[in-house]
Structures are given as structure tokens and as C-alpha cells.
Design a protein with these regions (language model features):
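Sequence signature of WD/YWTD-type beta-propeller architectures
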Residues: 211-510
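Bacterial Sec-dependent N-terminal signal peptides
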Residues: 1-24
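Extracellular glycan-recognition regions
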Residues: 23-216
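Intrinsically disordered/low-complexity terminal segments and short unstructured peptides
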Residues: 2, 19, 49, 83, ...
Length: 510
């Protein structure tokens, strides 16, 4: 197995072999070049296979009243959220070299700007120049050696979030910086030495245009969607498909060949991972499907949740994985499916009866439902462990939303997580060793709601107990990972992140 150092060394060889290559556009960016006068020429390369940017730049500094650095940029307007994981690579000279995100009013060396930066010595800071030629100011974050950098613009407010991968963000903010509506946005590298070129590698780069109409985020699912897969051991993310509308809650088929998701219009689709193409799934006259759908452990059947107003809302159905006419399972709604039993004989779901949402179980043949929880407040997201010993679920009974588990008959209910987040939708890996779940910030949402279009974490922890680790820093929430999404080898997960996507047709990732 290659070590991280070996991987970075390999990337450095790629850099050296591409120093003379000119690219008109670089990945998602419009252009690149050196900022400043008389700067030693730098260069930038995009590696489609890994979706990484390798940027090399020189320059005296990004500081004082003017800057010198290599910049890979895109023009953007309005509000946006920038995210990357950044690493230095190769031999280096100055501890003050810099990598990070930059937002500039112009490409002039003395332009007003805001940047989120990691230094060679580990200093992590939010830097800004309020007007052309003014002195650069700095907010030093409490964290050092951050390799996860996020920079968000909300009007004239700029929010920096930084973390060591696996940990929650540390945040700082500056307000009153007027860079104009249209700005240059991108990644930068500066060497802090005019005669030396330094190199940074940027992974998992996203530029998110967030939801603008905040009148009711609970029901409006209108943003574009990125279908992503992630390797949980390394954190490597890959956008494999993007569309300008809502798709939600990917499930991974047990044979590893396909994903299953719903769209915002209530239709179901399979996605071939080899060809990276979607296909509409025939679900007969059941065409108001929501994001609570699950594939059976043997891969032969799909459980659906679909709205039927006359029956009280969401109703559970089953249908063959190849499609067909669904069979109604639950007699009344709302009923939101979250899990199959490993033997394929039972379904577990969240149901509202008499004004309270609890966990229920029912035979795949229908019949009488069995109530498994009766605590006051919302119980949701029930899912069997692969060995069938537990049903995991999330409950607000403690005052915050946390992960719980119980025996399949509802006995021995015990709390699993207890931390500073609202935790939803635990999904157990096929090998039974790990679980991933969605974490909302308590300062942003109430305990009993899980809205879309929020800065959220997908976290992982051992099922045997221990600390949770952040796997993915995501703009999403509702619809991102509502139902099981592990690959059958327990090495990857699939999920949805959201952004405005130009309506030029669906684009498959490379």
C-alpha cells in the first residue's frame, strides 16, 4: 500500500513532467497566471483522474500593500462557498510559504482581497486587504496545520472554516469587505521567496453556489446535485455525476454495480457505475417517491416510500430491483422506510400515529405493524445491523438528536452518540465494523428537523464505540445520505452534495 508521502512524491513527478504544459481552462477554473510584477513564472496542472489541482508559484509574499503568487481563478458573482483539502509537496525553503483560497477584486498585485491560508509552519489564518494598496490584516485561527480550508462569502461577510482532516471546523469571520459583486475566486500558492517556486496539491475542490430563497428550506428541494463517492480510508471524494436539479439519497446495490436514487419529481433511477449513466426505473403508477428508499440485503427488491394523500402521506411499497408494479405494504401514512431485515422478511420505518413519530416494523407481506418505540418526540431512521442483532435509529428523547440502538423486538434501547451535534441516519457498514451518520450544527438547526442546504458533516465511528471522525464536509443535509449508501466491500460511501448547476445538461464525472 502506498503511503501518503509516496503519493505526494508521485504527484511531484507529475508536476515536473507538466511544467511546460499550457491549459486554456483548468478543471472548473477559467484561467491561471502569476499575480504581481516580474514574478518568477509559476504553473498549474489539473489531473482529471484524481480531480486534483497541482499549483506551483513564486513571489515575495501575499502581504503588506501588494502580493506576488500563482493564481488559478474563476469569475463569480453573489454568494458562494469554497472548499478544498490542501497540502504542500516537494522540497521547500521558507516556513512562510502559503497555500489557500483567494477572493480578489482584480488581478492587480495591490488589489483588495480576502484569503483563507495555511502557512508552511502551520499558521492558519484569515487575511484581507480592505482597499487597493492598503496594508494586509490578519485573523489568526486557534488551529494550526489545518489541511481543510473553506471560505464562504455572504454579501460583504467572509467566513473562514478550517480543520485538520477528520476534525470539526474552527471558524473566523470578517465583515465589511466590499470587493464588488463580481470577483476573481480561486486557489493560490506563494513561496515567500522571489527566487523559489513552491508547490501545493489541492484535492476535493468544490465551489458551491448556495440556496438563495430561505423561506422554507424544509420543503424546497430545487438546487442542483453532485453525486459523489468517497473512499472512507483516505477521504478521497469523486464527483461522478452532476445535474441542475435535485437527486437524493443514493443506495449502493449489493453487487457493487449500481446506485439507486430518487429525483425531485418523485421518480426513481438506477445509475450504472461502469458507464456512469442513469436509467429511469419503472415503478408503475407509484411516482411520488421520496428519499426514503432501501435495497434489500440480497439485492433482489427495493423498498419505496411514496406519497398518497388519501392514505395520510408517505406509504411504503416494495418492487423488484429490475422494476415493475409495486406492492403496497403499509396501510396508512405517513410511513417512511429506512431498513430491511437481513433475512428480507421485515421492514422498519418511521411512522406518525396519533401525532407522534416512532419506529415501526412490519412484514414484507404487509399486515399488522408493530410499534418498537414510544418515547416522546421524534424517533426516526431505523436500520438493521448486517448481523440482525440491532436496529439503529435516531431519537430526540435526550433533548438533542442522537443515535440510539435496540434489539429487533424494541427492547434494550440504548444511546450510542452523545456529543455537540444533532446526529441523524446511522448507516452500518456491510462488515458491521463502522457506521456513518449525518451531523447538523446545533446553532443552525433545531433538534427535530433535518433541512437541506446546510453546512453539515458526514461522520464515521466504530460500532464497538469510540470517537467519531469527520469523513466529509458537505453542503447538503436532507437528501444527502438519508438511507444506506455503503459499497458492499465497506470501503466507500455514496452521497449527494448540493450547489447551483448551470442547466446545460447532466455531466458525468471523470
Amino acid at each position: 500500500m502506498k503511503t501518503r508521502r509516496q503519493n505526494l512524491a508521485f504527484l511531484f513527478l507529475i508536476i515536473l513532467s507538466n511544467v511546460t504544459v499550457a491549459q486554456k481552462s483548468i478543471g472548473i477554473f477559467d484561467g491561471s497566471g502569476d499575480v504581481g510584477i516580474g514574478v518568477k513564472p509559476g504553473h498549474a496542472v489539473y489531473i482529471p483522474q484524481t480531480q486534483q489541482y497541482i499549483i506551483s508559484g513564486a513571489g515575495y509574499n501575499v502581504w503588506a500593500d501588494h502580493d506576488e503568487f500563482q493564481f488559478v481563478w474563476k469569475k463569480m458573482k453573489g454568494d458562494f462557498i469554497l472548499y478544498t483539502q490542501a497540502e504542500f509537496v516537494g522540497p521547500w525553503v521558507s516556513i512562510h510559504k502559503k497555500v489557500g483560497w483567494m477572493i480578489r477584486k482584480s488581478l492587480d498585485g495591490n488589489s483588495a482581497h480576502v484569503n483563507a491560508v495555511e502557512h508552511g509552519d502551520g499558521l492558519t489564518s484569515l487575511q484581507f486587504r480592505r482597499s487597493p494598496g492598503a496594508q494586509t490584516e490578519e485573523h489568526k485561527l486557534k488551529i494550526t496545520h489545518a489541511n481543510v480550508l473553506q471560505l464562504e462569502r455572504k454579501g460583504n461577510q467572509y467566513i473562514m472554516r478550517a480543520a485538520k482532516y477528520g476534525e470539526p471546523f474552527t471558524t473566523d469571520t470578517v465583515t465589511g469587505i466590499d470587493l464588488g459583486d463580481e470577483v476573481y475566486v480561486g486557489l493560490f500558492v506563494g513561496s515567500h521567496n522571489s527566487d523559489v517556486i513552491e508547490t501545493g496539491v489541492f484535492s476535493n475542490v468544490t465551489m458551491t453556489v448556495p440556496f438563495q430563497d430561505v423561506s422554507d428550506q424544509r420543503t424546497q428541494m430545487t438546487l442542483g446535485s453532485n453525486l459523489e463517492i468517497m473512499e472512507v480510508s483516505s477521504g478521497k471524494r469523486e464527483v461522478i455525476y452532476k445535474v441542475p436539479h435535485s437527486i437524493q439519497a443514493p443506495n449502493w446495490s449489493p453487487d457493487g454495480k449500481k446506485l439507486l436514487y430518487n429525483d425531485g419529481k418523485g421518480l426513481m433511477h438506477t445509475f450504472d457505475l461502469a458507464t456512469r449513466t442513469p436509467k429511469l426505473l419503472n415503478t408503475g403508477n407509484v411516482k411520488a417517491n421520496n428519499n426514503d428508499h432501501v435495497i434489500s440485503f440480497d439485492g433482489k427488491m427495493i423498498g419505496l416510500s411514496s406519497s398518497v394523500r388519501e392514505l395520510g402521506g408517505s406509504i411504503i411499497y416494495t418492487v423488484p430491483f429490475s422494476g415493475g408494479n409495486p406492492k403496497q405494504i403499509t396501510p396508512k401514512g405517513p410511513s417512511y422506510l429506512h431498513g430491511w431485515s437481513p433475512d428480507g422478511q421485515s421492514l422498519v420505518y418511521c411512522g406518525s400515529r396519533n401525532g407522534d413519530y416512532d419506529v415501526y416494523k412490519i412484514s414484507v407481506n404487509g399486515g399488522e405493524e408493530i410499534r418498537l418505540t414510544d418515547a416522546k418526540g421524534l424517533d426516526d431512521g431505523p436500520e438493521y445491523s448486517p448481523d440482525g442483532k440491532y436496529i439503529y435509529f435516531n431519537s430526540v428523547r435526550s433533548g438533542s438528536m442522537q443515535i440510539w440502538r435496540m434489539n429487533p423486538d424494541g427492547k434494550n434501547q440504548e444511546q450510542v452518540t452523545n456529543d455537540g451535534f444533532h446526529n441523524w441516519f446511522a448507516h452500518i457498514s456491510p462488515d458491521g465494523k463502522s457506521m456513518v451518520f449525518l451531523s447538523f450544527l446545533k446553532e443552525e438547526v433545531a433538534a427535530d428537523i433535518h433541512p437541506p442546504y446546510k453546512n453539515v458533516y458526514i461522520r464515521m465511528m466504530p460500532t464497538a464505540g469510540g470517537s467519531a471522525k469527520v469523513l466529509a464536509y458537505v453542503y447538503g443535509g436532507q437528501g444527502s445520505i438519508n438511507t444506506p449508501s455503503w459499497s458492499p466491500d465497506s470501503k466507500k460511501i455514496a452521497f449527494i452534495s448540493n450547489t447551483v448547476v448551470a442547466p446545460t445538461g447532466a455531466v458525468a464525472g471523470k
